[in-house]
Curated annotation (Swiss-Prot):
Function: Accelerates the degradation of transcripts by removing pyrophosphate from the 5'-end of triphosphorylated RNA, leading to a more labile monophosphorylated state that can stimulate subsequent ribonuclease cleavage.
Record-annotated Nudix hydrolase domain positions: 6-149
Similarity field: Belongs to the Nudix hydrolase family. RppH subfamily.
Protein's recorded name: RNA pyrophosphohydrolase
Family annotation (Gene3D superfamilies): Nucleoside Triphosphate Pyrophosphohydrolase (3.90.79.10)
UniProt cofactor(s): a divalent metal cation
SUPFAM superfamilies reported in the protein's UniProt record: Nudix
EC number: 3.6.1.-
Amino acid sequence: MIDRDGYRPNVGIILCNARNQVFWGKRIREHSWQFPQGGIKYGESPEQAMYRELMEEVGLRPEHVKILGRTRDWLRYDVPTNWIKREWRGSYRGQKQIWFLLRLIGRDSDVSLRASTHPEFDAWRWSDYWVAMDSVIEFKRDVYRMALKELSMHLTEHRRPRVAERVDQLVR
């Protein structure tokens, strides 16, 4: 399902623990790390897609998490042409995403990277909220920064990462 501008609707998930560290999944057989994300199926709401992707990629159910916030609007990124399947070239530009900020209220042991028959990740870790983006594929970095910045306002005040100084460091 691609919109008329060439963007595939998608959800992104920033999963935090009680210390506001974020979940990073390592892509299978790759050296890149990313947040869970996935396409929105026809007839599915962004929230329904988020819960489905969370289960498929991380093995967490709705009772394991609490929604803290979501982006106000779609965040978009373009995929470089050499990454686009030949049959999609000309009609596909990239992804538009609604991002969710979740708090893990379950245990770390509830995470299962093998909940799906087609796992996305082969390792995971908790990292600082404003982790450096050098392990994220380059064309997704700006969207990650925008999502982290917008959603940081939903974290508890005494644990909220300092946005301005960290974003400045990440942009360098």
